[in-house]
Amino acid sequence: IHTGAKTSAKGGFTTVICMANTSPTVDNIDTLKDNLNRASKEDIRIFQAAAISHSLKGQEEVDMAALKEAGACGFTDDGIPLLNAEFCYKAMEAAKALNVPVSLHEEDPAFIRNNGINHGKVSDELGIYGSPSIAEESLVARDCLLALRSGADVVIQHISSGVSVELVRTYKKLGANLHAEATPHHFSLTEDAVLKHGTLAKMNPPLRTEKDRQQII
């Protein structure tokens, strides 16, 4: 937390939200309060999100009400997708009742053979399959619908696909309370960066095509 706060301030960020996918996982009040206590000693404003599921396994719900009361600003299993649609929907309903956001990492591993690189021309050149955009788009489509039906405030994290962008726009027009965010590298680089920078350009979700980049912008 301390070094993160220092680098955030150096980069011009005066308010940040810490994710819950840490060790230990922020899925209980003791860990949450410990993190918030540490954060309170820093020179920037630091909020803490709590996990949606215990140990980020997507199976057992945390006590959202108790965690919110203890200071959680929202809920996320950041970095790990919620594959069970019913579980995800119930989490949205609970978050809606508490008036807090749910943030979702959208990659269905069933479609992915190699993490970190887009399934496309670059992966073909390297002789691997990679991670196709449908891995993201399929979960974005599902969760946009769940957001519409639940009425929850839902954030689609680090969006990488142009189709995903259009899905969010479509469901926002239908009345869903949706938001999406993109990283600087996803709107400034493409899959071609892997050929130049190697593993430094591999990430989840991966850098995609120029068309995707333009749609994200």
Where do the PLM segments sit?
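Metal-associated gating/positioning segment near the N- to mid-region
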Residues: 1-39
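Gly-rich Lys/Arg/Thr-decorated short loops/hinges at beta-loop-alpha junctions or inter-strand turns
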Residues: 13-18, 45-47, 119-128
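Short histidine/acidic/glycine/proline-rich micro-motifs that form metal-
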Residues: 21-25, 52-55, 81-82
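Short acidic, glycine/proline-enriched helix-loop-strand junctions
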Residues: 28-30, 44-46, 95-100
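Acidic (Asp/Glu)-rich catalytic clusters
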Residues: 35-41, 64-69
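A glycine-rich helix N-cap at a beta->alpha junction
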Residues: 37-52
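Structural motif
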Residues: 55-61
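Histidine/acidic residue-rich metal-binding segments in metalloenzymes
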Residues: 61-217
